[in-house]
Amino acid sequence: MALDFLILYEHTVREYESDLLLKLELERRGYTAEIRQLLDPKHLRLFGKDKPEVLVASCMYDNEAINSHVYNNIGRCNKIVNLHWEQMLSDTQEEGDWFNMNGNAKRCVQTCWGKRTAARLQAHGMDAKNTPVTGAVMMDFLRPEFDGYFKDKETLCREFGLDPAKQLHLYISSFGYASMNDDEVAELSKMAGTDFTGFAKTNREIGRAHV
């Protein structure tokens, strides 16, 4: 029996809990769903008897992304949904080609956290039917049902020896750029059409300070 949904994730911290919520909701509605890491060993069953009807991807910017997410994992698929995790962008990134989808990625469903993102993608040639405004899945963790799921401020301060009476400023980053050399940052900047030099420098400085 074919699988209804295959959900692929890249970064565990960024995506996995939200993917679990999505999987459970799909199963509650009677669908079959499976979660796999993008680079997991490939399974022939996903190209054949368990080939999913819908592939849910973590990113889908261009034909190369379609190749790595879709063809390499399940072969041809006509129903592709991108959870589109990278939506908090700078003005420069919003204006560039990379984050506005290219090639056949424009034919995939690109979920949007808000109307502004949907309007931007439509202005760059995407159909309205492929840019649904869904909100961000991870925001569901703020619902009352998840009270107590995360540690509160007092608990975290106690664990790390901080004063809970003080205001805390959190710098949230994967620090993915901290380990990249200048040539790698330059190549990424060229590919994305925006300059990541300053951001990479900040990542390195903060990363070294907390090692």
What role is predicted for each listed range?
Residues 3-150, 171-178:
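Active-site and donor-binding regions of nucleotide-sugar-utilizing enzymes
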